[in-house]
Curated annotation (Swiss-Prot):
The keyword DNA damage applies. GO terms for cellular component: bacterial nucleoid. Belongs to the RecO family. This is DNA repair protein RecO. InterPro entries: ARFGAP/RecO, NA-bd_OB-fold, RecO, RecO_C. NCBIfam families: reco.
Length: 243
């Protein structure tokens, strides 16, 4: 059976006989597939297999064999991102976030659309690292792992102090905060909520034009969420054959 779907290549790994194995993020979720002669210069869709490339893929499915990429029509090579180290680093941060949170073959059309929009807009931003941190917040929201209430997750006490404590997406009062919690000022927490609750993408682009020093805390918050989860994308290859 053949399917055609849009997708962004997240990783590209060489295999035997000039084959390559790619991880593609699509509306159908994370997919792994191999491309015969994908590493060869003679492959007419070779560029569509490069990481951070958006393409329309034709894929052959023959379980239990691994999917095979039959064709790839390059839609956007994201050349600007690949020619700038700060942009490449920020895009890489988003890619790693997807690889560490998304299960293979779990449909995620909304998250895919969000990720593609972030990739398309990140070259426009003055502070790409902050912009990619916004994506991490949106991803936490997508996973249902970000408490946006105004009270402590444990005791339900209203949070009225000047400092807000967060860990793994949960909120804590000063009494229940521990050494690993990440502290946010009221202003920083307000910015966090504005990012999460933004309904239009242009709002995020405009916000990313300001030198707001909160990306390190957002990244730490996301890392605290990962500390309690496994890495889904590493659990897939067992039992798969290329041919």
């Amino acid at each position: 059976m053949q399917i055609t779907l849009p997708g962004v290549v997240l990783t590209n790994s060489p295999a035997e006989k000039q084959y390559v194995i790619v991880k593609i993020f699509s509306p159908a979720g994370l997919l792994s597939a191999f491309a015969k002669n994908g590493a060869s210069l003679s492959c007419d869709f070779r560029e569509s297999l490069f990481p951070i490339s958006f393409s329309l893929f034709t894929i052959q499915q023959s379980p239990p064999k691994m999917r095979k990429v039959i064709q790839g029509e390059l839609q956007n090579p994201f050349t600007t991102i690949k020619s700038s180290y700060p942009l490449l680093q920020s895009a890489g941060k988003m890619i790693q976030a997807i690889l560490k949170t998304q299960w293979h073959e779990k449909p995620s059309p909304h998250l895919f659309s969000l990720f593609l929009n972030f990739l398309q807009r990140i070259p426009e931003t003055q502070y790409p690292n902050f912009f990619s941190s916004m994506f991490l917040l949106k991803l936490l929201q997508h996973e249902g792992s970000l408490d946006l209430s105004r009270s402590c997750t444990l005791c339900k006490t209203p949070l009225e102090s000047s400092t807000i404590y967060r860990y793994e997406g949960a909120l804590f009062c000063e009494k229940h905060a521990h050494e690993e919690t990440i502290s946010f000022s009221q202003e920083e927490d307000h910015i966090l909520r504005v990012i999460v609750q933004a309904k239009k993408f242009q709002e995020l682009v405009c916000l990313a034009e300001f030198p707001i020093d909160i990306d390190t805390k957002i990244d730490a918050l996301f890392s605290s969420f990962l500390s309690e989860t496994s890495e889904p994308s590493s659990l897939y290859y067992k039992g798969k054959t290329l041919l």
